[in-house]
């Protein structure tokens, strides 16, 4: 695989801040001797693009920097509409690539067809936080981490050659994976539910454990990810739990705890229920399935299902990165919790009805039904959190008490006043819309892969080379 077939992509909706991400990863790649095309995929509006694109041009990089924003995306979609020549399909195409978590990532898949793609979100950084005195891992333990107070002692930044770690495994059969990789069926997180990856409860320390099982030597590593520190996979509910537990914390937007890695080692597995598209790499040589085109935070769940078919494997590579949680353009905590609860419901429903897995798509039979029991289970959980929040406000000092009461009020409003019928009605509407969009659009995906593969090799896809300064 030649270097010009390796892409580093940064999906973002925060063009204002992405320049710092670009420069840090670019410098990291230079220090490790890599030359790679960097592409920013921007979900901003035209007005935000006009306002903040000049800041991207002020960056200084060693590598060539490219940009795919609202204008380039419109050109891309216009080309697809022209090739398909069917007005009835235009809505499905727009759904696949609409501004959303999954829609923006689907552009990255098209633009990197035929190569290897390494992706990092705009709030990731090319270093990790590790404990100063790493402990040995237990047998079958792949990673251990813990929450500690931010700004304290006992941990330092460490950097690993990220691209080399991905290149060691992506697109290779398991038999060619380096010998230091552990091998097994799946990784189990001691702090999360296996199939939804949602936190079971706030855990101040967790481990990833390897479950031994069959893994074919000729299975190809199609996706991989680094480990990560900072916030790891902390759910919105976990942030609230940390806020409730820390009586010195005045605001939910403050982060007094940070996730630090104690130790880790690489592993290759048959399944991956911990898919983390924020720090992932993909073998996109022959195309991959689309991310779910949704504004809910489960766009990568399709990959956790897709990888279960024969001949495919996943890896946690020998590197780690850090997540610097940004509150800029982030939904309020109550909205994030609602997003996660709906996502977890959809994960369970879709997973239980999968009917087909193939090279580029999946199929499932779930049609979007939401029972009264489904809705009540969510309401019971959130109502308990609401009550605990109000109780905590009673004995808190004024600033913290105000923050707790505001959060409780937002929680009640977001969950439709905890009124069961009203909540179920709106939950059904949201779920039905998401499922309809997903099912309709992914059926078209293989055709679009074929169209884009031809055009990319013939004339390229619309993108702008950023006129920034070279180091």
Where is each model-derived feature located?
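Active-site-proximal specificity loops/subdomain of glycosyltransferases
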Residues: 48-114, 131
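Conserved nucleotide-sugar donor-binding
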Residues: 271-290
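Extended catalytic-interface subdomain
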Residues: 144-274
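Terminal low-complexity segments of carbohydrate-biosynthetic enzymes
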Residues: 10-13, 20, 24, 38, ...
């Amino acid at each position: 695989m030649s270097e010009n077939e390796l892409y580093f992509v940064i999906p973002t909706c925060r063009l204002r801040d992405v320049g710092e991400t670009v420069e840090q990863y670019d410098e990291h790649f230079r220090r490790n001797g890599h030359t790679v095309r960097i592409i920013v995929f921007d979900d901003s509006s035209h007005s935000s693009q006009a306002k903040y694109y000049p800041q991207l041009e002020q960056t200084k990089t060693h590598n060539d920097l490219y940009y795919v924003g609202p204008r380039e995306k419109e050109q891309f979609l216009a080309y697809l509409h022209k090739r398909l020549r069917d007005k009835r399909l235009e809505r499905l195409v727009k759904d696949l690539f609409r501004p959303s978590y999954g829609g923006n990532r689907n552009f990255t898949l098209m633009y990197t067809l035929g190569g290897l793609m390494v992706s990092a979100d705009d709030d990731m950084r090319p270093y990790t936080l590790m404990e100063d005195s790493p402990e040995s891992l237990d047998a079958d333990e792949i990673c251990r981490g813990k929450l500690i107070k931010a700004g304290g002692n006992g941990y330092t930044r460490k950097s690993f050659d990220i691209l080399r770690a991905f290149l060691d495994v992506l697109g290779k059969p398991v038999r060619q994976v380096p010998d230091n990789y552990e091998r097994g069926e799946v990784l189990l997180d001691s702090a999360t539910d296996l199939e939804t990856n949602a936190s079971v409860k706030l855990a101040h320390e967790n481990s990833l454990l390897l479950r031994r099982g069959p893994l074919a030597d000729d299975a190809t590593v199609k996706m991989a990810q680094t480990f990560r520190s900072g916030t790891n996979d902390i759910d919105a509910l976990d942030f609230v739990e940390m806020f409730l537990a820390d009586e010195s914390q005045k605001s939910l937007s403050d982060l007094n705890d940070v996730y630090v890695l104690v130790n880790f080692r690489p592993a290759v597995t048959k399944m991956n229920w911990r898919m983390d598209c924020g720090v992932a790499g993909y073998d996109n040589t022959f195309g991959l399935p689309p991310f779910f085109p949704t504004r809910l935070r489960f766009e990568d769940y399709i990959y956790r299902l897709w990888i279960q078919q024969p001949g495919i494997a996943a890896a946690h590579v020998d590197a780690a990165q850090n997540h610097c949680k940004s509150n800029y353009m982030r939904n309020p905590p109550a909205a994030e919790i609602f997003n996660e609860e709906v996502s977890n419901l959809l994960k369970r429903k879709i997973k239980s009805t999968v009917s087909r897995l193939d090279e580029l798509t999946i199929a499932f039979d779930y049609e979007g039904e939401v029972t009264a029991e489904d809705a009540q289970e969510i309401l019971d959980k959130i109502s308990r959190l609401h009550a605990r929040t109000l109780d905590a406000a009673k004995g808190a000092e004024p600033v913290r008490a105000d923050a707790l009461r505001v959060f409780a009020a937002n929680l009640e409003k977001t969950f439709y006043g905890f009124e069961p019928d009203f909540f179920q009605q709106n939950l059904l509407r949201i779920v039905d819309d998401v499922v309809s969009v997903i099912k309709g659009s992914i059926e078209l995906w293989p055709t679009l892969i074929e169209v884009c593969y031809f055009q990319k090799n013939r004339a390229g896809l619309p993108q702008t080379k950023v006129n920034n300064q070279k180091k």
